Amino acid sequence: VGGAAVHAGTGKVCAAPSALTRAGFPLPHLARALHDRSPATILVLNSATAAKKARPGSEKDVLLRSFPSYIEETLRARYPDGGVVVTTHNEPRATAEAILPGMPAVLEKTKPALVIWQTGTYDTILGADTSAFSDAVSTGISYAREAGADVIVVSPQYSPHTAFAFDVAPYNNALRWAARSSGVPFFDRYSVMRFWEDEGIFDFDSARPSPSLFDDVHRCIGRLLVGVIVDGVEMRTLGSR
């Protein structure tokens, strides 16, 4: 099975099956912003707004970077004249439906060309109705499009410590359906991370995880998402030159 493989920068190879790393749909708004060299703002919605600090006394007692910073760094290198700026908006412990009322204002303030929407975690924890969840995601995608932005939907993270307690599968399926029916890319982070665990690329089940695990995983997620973004930007649509 073919797949994407990028280096995390620490010797880790962030391999993933190609089915999980393709855009599947174009990103015309971002492509236009990059081409016109206008500000190509990418909004990461429901992401941590600050880097995480390693535990005191650990071998890496430094600020650890989350994946939006790697997206910005890598896209700026690929499109040096594109004016790429990555910004985040965090609404912790919010379901997809709870985010909707404030979403238009966030879009108006940031004016993104692309929204990377991480959602489904708290819907899963709370056992939200999957149909209502899917409808909320579809509505959010519509809000972004009305504001002139493309969308990439990102599923929850995988953790073996919580997988036995919460069934993510119905929400992943709902996200996939909402994304495909709306014609936007779906990045199945849950399945990517599960693949890494199964293949021994990362050990998420360790009682004492390596201090570098957070940074390595976010670097890999960021670079795989860049692959999805580039795929969507460079995808030729019917009738394009």
Regions of interest found by a model, annotated:
Residues 157-241:
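Catalytic His-Asp segment of secreted/periplasmic serine-dependent ester chemistry enzymes
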Residues 52-54, 96-98, 123-130, 161-165, ...:
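Extracytoplasmic/secreted cell-surface and envelope-processing proteins
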Residues 49, 88-94, 116-126, 180, ...:
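Cell-envelope and extracellular/periplasmic
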Residues 118-122, 140-172, 197:
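Active-site segments of SGNH/GDSL-like serine hydrolases
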Residues 3-88, 105-111:
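Serine-esterase "nucleophile elbow" of acetyl-processing enzymes
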Residues 41-43, 65, 72-76, 80-110, ...:
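Internal alpha/beta domain cores that form substrate/cofactor-binding pockets in large enzymes
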Residues 27, 31, 68, 72, ...:
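Extracytoplasmic/secreted envelope proteins and their assembly/folding machinery
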Residues 36, 61-66, 93, 97, ...:
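Soluble non-cytosolic domains of exported or imported proteins
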